[in-house]
């Protein structure tokens, strides 16, 4: 773990100097529960830190993996029946405009599977210079128990917006949406997010909630802020109950449907965060949300937010909470390429779970868990 600790302080940490984390996303979102559509606008601020000028920006369009006819569909065949209990359903992302400084920019949908948005800049961007690009888009959600989709009681908004492709050796990396494992890799950035949704929804979120304003039309406007994180996600439900607690300097919010042991789950989340703080260094964020949701896998990690499947039995639920919480360090704070080096964050997260059991024997015998 010594190498990992070395990288810990060079990863996503809000105490990092602002000049080290330069890109930012301002997202304005509106969710229509009748059409299951998320309308969005994004202002993306980018500084060229490459050693040479660049003439375009490249963004991942992960939402297009849910469209009909996708060559790299989001859901693997072996999970299809679990993900689509009501039959196949499709979604996609549509780009409606791209501009900068009120001037339209040329763009194209490209990649192996219409999974990339290429934005051509009006002039080459030299090293150290910056540009702000505005992208308007609309996401149609599929009826699917997955990272991005809706069911009769939850709306999962993971990997929904255009996100800048990871850069390596002064070039953008292009990856399709592999449906086994986590097909994502991104640098840290700052996020300011505004969401308008029906007031009946409770919203689990990345970042911190800055404000909540009820509107006369029956909607609520939420504002969130997340600094130096690798992504931003949300989970919405009209059925959520919420329990809150604290772990060291972090506020914990647990969103659940019908967990008969909800108080124990909240205590588990707090204990996990405290244990990992002691083992790996303090969690650098003030808020952490755990959201039970309809999901065909065990769980999914996002910065300051994790999804936990509603279909797990208790023992699986506990181990998944521990595993996904460990991902806050391994992938979140300590970054790695989750596509080419999945063994790293997954291996360290599972190892962290074993360390938790060793330090907290009241949650299970370490030797038994190790077997």
Range-by-range predicted roles:
Residues 46-50:
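Asparagine-centered strand-capping/turn motif at beta-strand->loop junctions
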Residues 115-119, 131, 220:
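Short strand-edge motifs at loop-to-beta-strand transitions and within beta-strands
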Residues 27-29, 106, 120-125, 179-183, ...:
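Beta-strand-rich interaction surfaces with strong enrichment in secreted/lumenal proteins
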Residues 182-322, 351:
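Hydrophobic helix-coil surface modules that form long, contiguous segments used
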Residues 43, 82-91, 96, 133-235:
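Extended, low-hydrophobicity, Ser/Thr/Pro/Gly-biased non-transmembrane segments
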Residues 306-368:
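Zinc-dependent metallopeptidase catalytic helix centered on the HExxH motif
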Residues 3-7, 11-39:
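N-terminal, polar/Ser/Thr-rich
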């Amino acid at each position: 773990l010594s190498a990992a600790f070395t990288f810990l302080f060079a990863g996503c940490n809000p105490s990092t100097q602002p000049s080290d984390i330069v890109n930012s996303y301002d997202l304005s979102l509106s969710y229509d529960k009748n059409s299951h559509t998320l309308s969005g606008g994004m202002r993306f601020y980018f500084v060229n830190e490459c050693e040479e000028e660049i003439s375009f920006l490249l963004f991942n369009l992960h939402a297009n993996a849910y469209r009909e006819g996708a060559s790299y569909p989001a859901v693997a065949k072996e999970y299809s029946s679990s993900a689509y209990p009501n039959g196949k359903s499709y979604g996609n992302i549509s780009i409606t405009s791209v501009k900068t400084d009120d001037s339209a920019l040329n763009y194209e949908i490209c990649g192996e599977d219409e999974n990339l948005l290429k934005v051509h800049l009006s002039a080459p961007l030299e090293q150290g210079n910056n540009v702000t690009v505005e992208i308007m888009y609309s996401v149609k959600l599929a009826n699917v128990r997955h990272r991005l989709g809706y069911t009769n009681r939850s709306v999962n908004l993971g990997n929904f917006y255009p996100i800048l492709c990871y850069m390596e050796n002064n070039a953008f990396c292009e990856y399709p949406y592999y449906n086994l494992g986590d097909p994502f890799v991104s640098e840290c950035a700052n996020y300011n997010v505004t969401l308008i949704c029906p007031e009946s929804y409770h919203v689990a979120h990345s970042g911190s909630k800055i404000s909540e304003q009820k509107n006369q039309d029956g909607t609520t406007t939420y504002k969130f802020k997340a600094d130096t994180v690798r992504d931003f996600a949300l989970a919405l439900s009209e059925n959520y109950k919420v329990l809150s607690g604290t772990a060291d300097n972090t506020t914990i919010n647990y969103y659940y449907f019908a967990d008969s042991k909800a108080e124990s789950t909240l205590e588990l989340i707090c204990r996990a965060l405290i244990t990992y703080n002691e083992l790996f260094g303090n969690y650098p964020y003030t808020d952490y949300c755990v959201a039970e949701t309809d999901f065909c896998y065990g769980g999914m990690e996002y910065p300051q937010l994790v999804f936990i499947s509603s279909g797990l039995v208790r023992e699986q639920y506990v181990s998944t909470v521990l595993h996904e919480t460990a991902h806050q360090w391994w992938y979140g704070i300590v970054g790695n390429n989750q596509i080419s080096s999945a063994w790293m964050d997954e291996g360290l997260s599972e190892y962290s779970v074993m360390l938790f059991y060793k330090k907290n024997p009241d949650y299970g015998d370490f030797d038994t868990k190790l077997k």
